[in-house]
């Protein structure tokens, strides 16, 4: 047992405040970076980013022409960037050599490295004439640099050190929950800023001339630029609601310092002003001054949320007599990750990505590929999280699931439900906006099937729950297919049915392995109702059906010889394991079949992709 705390995931955080000189220097550095970010917004909105067409000089000179305003705006931006460098370097050097504080010099070192990277990226931006993607990355780096310096500044002040540290884990749980809540809002703000930069860079600012709806009172326009514009507004609305809800929740938390609440309240107040400014900006035709103010306010809101998050993190890690490992940042976030069942999500994304490659007969358009996987990750993660919320009482009665975040008390049920809903809605919006409505509708159907039909009804009702409910997993490859083609073809139905037939052998093998858990919890899984031997026969039966169905693409000449040979080997492997399980329906054969079925599905999709690519 040691005094807890760490740098952002590192070791050796000292919770006491540092000298006033370093504190003042860090505040000055943060203000300089904030000014740099705001000036960058002015440069971007006035179109002055190419005011100096070369780099690092300006028109081949150290000083730009006196009569060229755009050149001076860009030159001052570069000068501010150059002035931030020594401030950052000096702060890091003092934190390292004099204070010997890893929790301070590590984020400052990262910030300095990112600053050099941002300077190089700025040169690329000029040379490539401001491509929107590079501009968005440049903004993202600026926001991360500001956040790292603010985290160091808050740690240097250490407001939590004014009171004795708590001595048990329960006492820091409210602060840990605040870290997660503020962090989620911060990530949403980060995404909102990047989407806003994409709206400006892509020309989508003018796609909707009305407010709050799009042109002509349309809620969701059909064209891509209109959808991107409205996605930004919907995301802004969601972030505003989340920020307001967070302020309301923190206002009633007496165990949390009021300073954390006041920073979030300030962010929410600025956000209300920001929304009004956005509407005025649209009505006035996006004048440069208002645009710059809009982006400057965004930086101020981001800074306020980061300060609140860093303060809450310090509170969560200010403990004595608690294992330090349990208070590391990654462990404070762990409940959210575990809630989404990342192993299941990863396998679903393999089938989605595989279907996209098969449909495209090669690499899909890169942005479509990224947005489909991102949307799929959020929707499937949200569905799994909602499954955890609904099954929380059931999970408490099962040894295998009792350590999940909700039954173990690491996460409240309402907090988990909010996270599940946010992930799901965000994923569906991404698919609808950046991919196509068909993919979004199919993802929604899969979500409803898994949460509404399987989790809420079938799981507790019938031993055939997994046969019917297993169709939910079949939607993942169909979403991938529709993302590329915009429709559902016969091959997509084949992939759906493949997952449908694969699910019973996979799940019942696991149910045989964990039969005692299901029996004690009262879940009517097939091995509980019929016994392991009868369930093992059903595993063999569905494995035979799966093997036969896998040959359909060869029969219709959709896939070729490579697939035929590979499918034969994979099916023989799984059939042998299923036969052995039927002969000996015990834990060891069930475990082998369960793990093999995961590998089977992965290699099956790799095989189909390889066959399509070779066939051209």
Model-based region annotation:
Residues 2-3, 8-336, 345, 361, ...:
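Polytopic transmembrane helical bundles with strong interfacial aromatic enrichment
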Residues 39, 190-198, 378-386, 449-455, ...:
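Transmembrane alpha-helical segments that form the membrane-embedded catalytic/substrate-channel core
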Residues 81-88, 235-244, 345-349, 420-426, ...:
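Core segments of transmembrane alpha-helices
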Residues 120, 134, 413, 417-484:
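Intramembrane alpha-helical segments
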Residues 143-148, 351-353, 405, 468-484, ...:
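Small-residue-rich segments of transmembrane alpha-helices in multi-pass membrane proteins
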Residues 290-293, 575-603:
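Interfacial loop-to-transmembrane junctions
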Residues 357-374, 426-441, 477-499, 551-563, ...:
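Helix-coil boundary and interhelical linker segments in multi-pass alpha-helical membrane proteins
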Residues 400-441, 531-554:
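Multi-pass membrane catalytic core of lipid/isoprenoid biosynthesis enzymes
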């Amino acid at each position: 047992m040691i005094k807890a705390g760490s740098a952002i995931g590192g070791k050796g955080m000292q919770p006491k405040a540092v000298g006033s000189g370093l504190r003042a220097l860090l505040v000055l550095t943060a203000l300089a970076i904030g000014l740099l970010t705001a000036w960058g917004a002015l440069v971007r909105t006035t179109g002055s980013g190419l005011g100096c067409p070369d780099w690092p000089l300006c028109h081949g000179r150290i000083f730009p022409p006196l009569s060229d305003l755009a050149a001076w705006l860009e030159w001052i931006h570069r000068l501010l960037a150059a002035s931030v460098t020594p401030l950052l370097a000096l702060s890091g050097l003092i934190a390292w050599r004099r204070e010997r504080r890893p929790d301070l010099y590590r984020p400052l070192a990262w910030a300095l490295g990112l600053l050099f990277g941002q300077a190089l990226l700025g040169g690329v931006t000029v040379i490539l004439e401001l491509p929107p993607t590079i501009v968005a990355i440049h903004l993202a780096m600026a926001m991360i640099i500001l956040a790292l310096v603010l985290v160091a500044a808050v740690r240097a002040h250490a407001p939590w050190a004014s009171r004795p540290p708590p001595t048990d884990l329960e006492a820091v749980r409210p602060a840990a929950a605040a870290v997660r809540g503020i962090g989620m809002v911060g990530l949403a703000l980060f995404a909102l800023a990047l989407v806003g930069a994409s709206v400006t860079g892509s020309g989508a600012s003018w796609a909707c001339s009305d407010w709050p709806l799009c042109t002509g009172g349309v809620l969701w326009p059909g064209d891509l630029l209109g959808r991107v514009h409205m996605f930004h507004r919907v995301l802004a609305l969601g972030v505003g609601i989340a920020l307001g809800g967070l302020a309301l929740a923190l206002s009633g938390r007496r165990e949390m310092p009021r300073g954390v609440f006041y920073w979030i309240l300030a962010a929410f107040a600025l956000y209300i002003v920001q929304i009004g400014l956005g509407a005025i900006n649209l009505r006035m035709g996006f004048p440069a001054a208002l645009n710059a103010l809009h982006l400057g306010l965004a930086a101020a809101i981001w800074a306020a949320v980061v300060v609140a998050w860093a303060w809450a993190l310090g509170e969560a890690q200010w403990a004595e007599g608690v294992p330090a490992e349990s208070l590391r940042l990654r462990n404070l976030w762990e409940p959210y990750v575990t809630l989404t069942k990342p192993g299941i999500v990863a396998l679903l994304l393999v089938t989605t990505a595989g279907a996209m490659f098969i449909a495209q007969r090669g690499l899909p358009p890169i942005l479509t590929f990224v947005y489909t996987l991102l949307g799929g990750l959020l929707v499937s993660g949200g569905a799994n999280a909602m499954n955890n919320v609904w099954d929380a009482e059931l999970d408490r009665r099962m040894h295998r699931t009792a350590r999940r975040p909700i039954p173990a008390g690491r996460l409240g049920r309402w907090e988990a439900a909010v996270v599940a809903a946010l992930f799901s809605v965000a994923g569906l919006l991404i698919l609808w906006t950046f991919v196509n409505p068909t993919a979004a509708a199919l993802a929604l159907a899969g979500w409803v099937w898994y949460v509404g039909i399987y989790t809420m009804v079938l799981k507790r009702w019938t031993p055939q729950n997994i046969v019917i409910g297993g169709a939910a997993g079949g939607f993942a490859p169909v979403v991938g297919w529709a993302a590329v083609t915009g429709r559902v073809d016969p091959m997509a139905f084949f992939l759906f049915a493949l997952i449908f037939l694969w699910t019973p052998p996979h799940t019942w093998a696991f149910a045989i392995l964990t039969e005692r858990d299901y029996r004690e919890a009262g879940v009517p899984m097939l091995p509980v109702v019929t016994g392991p031997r009868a369930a093992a026969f059903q595993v063999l039966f569905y494995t035979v059906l799966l093997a036969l169905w896998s040959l359909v693409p060869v029969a219709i000449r959709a896939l070729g010889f490579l697939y035929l040979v590979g499918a034969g080997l994979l099916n023989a492997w799984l059939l042998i394991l299923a036969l052995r399980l039927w002969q000996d329906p015990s834990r060891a054969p069930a475990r082998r079949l369960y793990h093999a079925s995961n590998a089977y599905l992965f290699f099956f999709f790799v095989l189909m992709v390889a066959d399509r690519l070779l066939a051209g």
